[in-house]
């Protein structure tokens, strides 16, 4: 019997989707509510791999999703998502419950951090375009330990062209 939890090709198997109480920041990341479960939890053992995006095959140089800033809702960005991926991108949101209230709340919080950073910089007289590039570098590039910020796709969407310029500069090799 194949053990999918140990299979690198099954990257979704590593996310417990809010179902594990013994995680860092459990008060934020864990929920007893079934509606809050995402990723591997709703996927379970269902054979949906042909209907959803494979994380190993998503092109790095295009943005697939956009977000509603006031709700944190994830939406396929039909302006930037390649047409041949739109159906699978929608299925991915639905099948993995990527609009679980827990995830939407966490996305809103990430957006609010960026909004606060921008508001503070503007109040200090910093030039907006320059600051967006600084934010993109600080929030999208790995830190000294090689770790990236949570909600990379949200940050990428929010920072728009500044994010795309930084990612392009680094050859999307993040």
Residue ranges and their predicted role:
Residues 80-174:
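C-terminal, charged low-complexity interaction regions
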Residues 24-47, 121-136:
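A broadly tuned preference for mixed-charge, low-complexity surface segments
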Residues 2, 59-61, 125, 151:
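Generic detection of intrinsically disordered/low-complexity segments and helix-coil linkers/edges
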Residues 1-35:
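Histidine-centered nuclease catalytic patch
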Residues 14, 71-73, 163:
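A generic structural signal for solvent-exposed, polar alpha-helical segments
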Residues 33-119:
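Conserved, surface-exposed functional patches that form binding/active-site neighborhoods
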């Amino acid at each position: 019997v194949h053990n999918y939890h140990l299979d690198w090709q099954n990257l979704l198997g590593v996310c417990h989707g809010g179902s594990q109480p013994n995680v860092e920041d459990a008060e934020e990341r864990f929920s007893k509510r079934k509606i809050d479960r995402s990723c591997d939890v709703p996927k379970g053992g269902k054979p949906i791999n042909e209907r959803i995006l494979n994380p190993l095959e998503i092109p790095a140089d295009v943005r697939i999703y956009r977000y509603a800033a006031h709700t944190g809702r994830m939406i396929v960005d039909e302006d930037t998502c390649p047409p041949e991926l739109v159906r699978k991108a929608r299925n991915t949101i639905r099948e993995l419950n990527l609009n679980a209230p827990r995830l939407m709340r966490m996305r809103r919080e990430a957006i609010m951090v960026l909004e606060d950073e921008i508001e503070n910089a503007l109040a200090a007289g910093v030039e907006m375009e320059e600051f967006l590039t600084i934010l993109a570098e600080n929030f999208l590039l790995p830190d000294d330990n090689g770790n990236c910020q949570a909600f990379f796709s949200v940050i990428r969407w929010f920072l728009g062209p500044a994010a795309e310029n930084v990612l392009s500069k680094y050859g999307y090799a993040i």
